[in-house]
């Protein structure tokens, strides 16, 4: 059974607060997205397995802990998810990166897939799917469906801001997936935007409208 973790770290909350401001420009917004992703990655990798390894320090031989050879992958949901990749790779630089491309139909608010490129051995990796916003949950559910159809079993989902509606939909569709959230907001408005939210994350990351 997966777990839902809402981050309460002061640094995460502070940075998200700055991201929400309308006067935060794209350059600063991009930096904040990357920094929050790195902080969330720290928490999301807490349960990675360790193994004992014998090494030699400048003083003597010693037994130290190292990651137990688990292969990792980061899979952003395009396009906004790209903003979280650099922060993730700061902590797990050996991870492979896949990409899932989706956009939200303006009429139905449901996701439409247009691209999928994953590491060849993705089924054997522990996969972290990243997207700054979890609104309706449609794109997240569809992305996890795609991964599972390709044999991926060990999946985590990470977002910066989520709506309760999206969390409910995601956890009901994929109850085995751990979900990591920077901030859980109030609700979705009539246009399916998160309230209070921070606007369109993709537009704010890339300076588009």
Curated annotation (Swiss-Prot):
Membership in a protein family: Belongs to the UPRTase family.
Cross-referenced HAMAP family: Upp_B (MF_01218_B)
Any one GO biological process: uracil salvage
Organism of this sequence: Agathobacter rectalis (strain ATCC 33656 / DSM 3377 / JCM 17463 / KCTC 5835 / VPI 0990) (Eubacterium rectale)
Activity regulation statement: Allosterically activated by GTP.
Keyword flag Transferase: yes
Protein name: Uracil phosphoribosyltransferase
Gene responsible for this protein: upp
Cofactor note: Binds 1 Mg(2+) ion per subunit. The magnesium is bound as Mg-PRPP.
Chain sites annotated for binding uracil: 194, 199-201
Residues reported to bind 5-phospho-alpha-D-ribose 1-diphosphate: 79, 104, 131-139, 200
Keyword terms, alphabetized: Allosteric enzyme, Glycosyltransferase, GTP-binding, Magnesium, Nucleotide-binding, Transferase
InterPro entries from the UniProt entry: PRibTrfase_dom, PRTase-like, Upp_B, UPRTase/APRTase, Ura_phspho_trans
Pathway entry: Pyrimidine metabolism; UMP biosynthesis via salvage pathway; UMP from uracil: step 1/1
EC class (word): transferase
UniProt KW Transferase keyword: yes
């Amino acid at each position: 059974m997966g777990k839902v973790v809402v981050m309460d770290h002061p640094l995460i909350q502070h940075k998200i607060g700055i991201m929400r401001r309308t006067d935060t420009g794209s350059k600063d917004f991009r930096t904040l997205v990357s920094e929050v992703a790195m902080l969330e990655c720290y928490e999301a990798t807490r349960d990675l397995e360790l193994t004992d390894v014998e090494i030699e320090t400048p003083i003597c031989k010693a037994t130290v802990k190292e990651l137990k050879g688990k292969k990792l992958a980061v899979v952003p949901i395009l396009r906004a998810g790209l903003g979280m990749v650099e922060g993730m790779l700061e902590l797990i630089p050996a991870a492979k990166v896949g990409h899932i491309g989706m956009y939200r139909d303006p009429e139905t608010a449901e996701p439409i897939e247009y691209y999928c490129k994953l590491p060849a051995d993705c089924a054997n990796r522990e996969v972290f799917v990243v997207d700054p916003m979890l609104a309706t949950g449609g794109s997240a559910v569809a992305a996890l469906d795609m991964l599972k159809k390709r044999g991926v079993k060990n999946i985590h989902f990470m977002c910066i801001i989520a709506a309760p509606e999206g969390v409910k939909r995601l956890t009901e569709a994929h109850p085995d997936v751990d979900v990591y959230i920077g901030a859980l907001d109030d609700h979705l408005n009539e246009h399916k935007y998160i309230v209070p939210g921070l606007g369109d994350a993709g537009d704010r990351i890339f300076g588009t409208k």
